Amino acid sequence: MSVSPSSPAPTENPPAATEDLAWRKHIPALAAAVAGIREASDAWDAVSDSFCDTDGWPVDEQGYEDAKVKRDAEAWRHVEVFLDHGPEVLAGVRATARSADYAEGPLSEDLRWLRGIDATLEHAGQLQREWDQILALMDASMPGSRQLYEGRTKEERNADGWHYADELAIRGPALVRAAEHLVRRADAEQSAHTTRARAALARSASGLRGTMPASPPAPSAPGAPVPGRSR
């Protein structure tokens, strides 16, 4: 299977010690973010039709817009979690996965789904940086204007970010599954290594006990007759 140009080429990595997988601590946050984006999307799907006629045109435009604003805001909150935790987990997965994982096995499909997630995270991060710059310009050039315009600019950012939230709802689960699989495998390999090491140590200790030299005979008691000598 070919690898995306944006993805580093897989290498044959030795079994990773579990203590080296520092990125594992970020996995629960990503799993929660995936669930959060899905919940925001499902909540929108549940009410969006109620604001529209049978042809799909809004009949309650204000209600439709308010519900969409709420969806975008909730989804973006979880996109920010991906921006904080996703790059480190993605790098860890790619550093830990082996060449064989890309070709076949339980990881292969999830690794394929990770193609393009770099671009999604980069574009979402750029959107966040642009919004931060806008706020900084407001504070610098129009003191006091932030309170007037921040809410509206935030809504615009969230609306633009919905596309990236939707992408992460598709590719994010693959990242979480791949990360969890690699961590479990590393734990299992580390446990097996520890078991083998203990068994080898036990065999070594047993062998040393079996070859210990015999103790020298105890000296004869004083006055005892010497064997082989006549009186």
Protein language model annotation of sequence segments:
Residues 194-231:
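Long low-complexity, Ser/Thr/Pro- and charged-rich intrinsically disordered regions
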Residues 46-153:
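Long, low-complexity or tandemly repetitive, helically biased scaffold regions used
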Residues 111-205:
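Amphipathic alpha-helical coiled-coil/helical-stalk segments
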Residues 1-81:
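Leu/Val/Ala/Ile-rich N-terminal alpha-helices, chiefly Sec-type signal peptides and the beginnings
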